[in-house]
Amino acid sequence: MSFDLKLSGGDLVIQGGKLQTVTDGEKLLQDILKMCLTTAGTNPVHPWYGSFLSRTIIGNSLNASVLVQIGKSQLNTCLENLKKLQDLQVKSLQKVSADEQISAISDISIIRNEINPTLYDIRISVLTKGFKTINASFRLSAL
């Protein structure tokens, strides 16, 4: 089973003087959020890592329904890239649990906030290879 350092609000979580870690579904949730919230091209070693979601939505004057469809497509692409990364981990004989691997992308929804149209609420649902549903959600500002 693999693990990652636990993050909260972008900071490492330390409890009792020890760095906390995440595994299984909690790790997959964190991996999904990191992949979707990292702007593609910002990691010089892995320029393909991340999504173009923020570049699409922030400051764009296209119709909201067009932005939503483009955003869904970009999130789907970045989640497929995450699946490929997970497959590479398994092929390299790294121990990766079934609950930290995406089996299928169940749903991606992007909803423009009715009160503040500069905000988009994003929800992602995936099925793990351990047959568990993982739901990730975050808010993106178009400003």
PLM regions and their residue ranges:
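Mid-chain, well-packed structural core segment of small domains
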Residues: 66-103
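Immediate N-terminus of the mature polypeptide
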Residues: 1-69, 100-143
